[in-house]
A protein has these predicted regions:
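Hydrophobic pocket/interface hotspot
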Residues: 84, 103, 114
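Short, well-ordered amphipathic alpha-helical segments that serve as non-catalytic structural scaffolds
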Residues: 74-89
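Acidic helix-start/capping segments at beta-turn-to-alpha-helix junctions
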Residues: 98-107
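Alpha-helix N-cap/start motif
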Residues: 94-95
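N-terminal presequence-like segments and the immediate start of the first folded domain
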Residues: 2-78, 106-153
Length: 153
């Protein structure tokens, strides 16, 4: 029984070794895809950040905020979700393909009202989500909420 197991293990190791050598053959080096960026924001003529970045079938959407009146959480949440959706569409994805959302609230007291607008926006299989309240002034500009997300194509 032990000899039989050893024989099987030896064959398995030999097979894995052969596959490794075969995989290292000339010309089999995997091509690394180039990162694709969209909506680049410059600072003093130097690229600062992108509105979205795509690598393979993964899309990373930069934080979106609402910097307009009315300064009310439900209105800002609606604006931010629409901006996320527009950026996802430009990148070839959709709200239903979002895997992860980060929500940054200017005030944790806005949590429930933000949820009222947020619910149902990502289809029947919502993404995982992290929500944090940042210190006053922690959300850039005068937005009451900022969101970013990760999706696939």
């Amino acid at each position: 029984m032990k000899a039989e197991r050893r024989s099987i293990v030896k064959k398995l190791i030999a097979s894995v070794g052969a596959l490794s050598v075969f995989g290292m053959a000339k010309g089999s080096t995997p091509q690394i895809e180039e990162k694709e960026v969209n909506n680049v924001t410059n600072y003093e003529d130097v690229p600062l950040f992108s509105g979205s970045t795509r690598m393979g079938n993964m899309i990373f959407i930069a934080g979106k905020g609402a910097h307009v009146e009315p300064f009310e959480i439900k209105a800002h949440t609606e604006i931010v979700l629409k901006e996320l959706e527009a950026e996802l569409k430009k990148a070839g994805s959709s709200m239903e393909k979002v895997l992860k959302v980060n929500v940054y609230l200017n005030d944790i007291a806005d949590y429930q009202s933000m949820n009222e607008v947020y619910k149902g926006r990502f289809g029947k299989k919502p993404p995982v989500r992290t929500t944090v309240a940042v210190a006053k002034g922690g959300v850039p500009g005068n937005s009451l909420v900022e969101m970013d997300c990760i999706a696939y194509v």
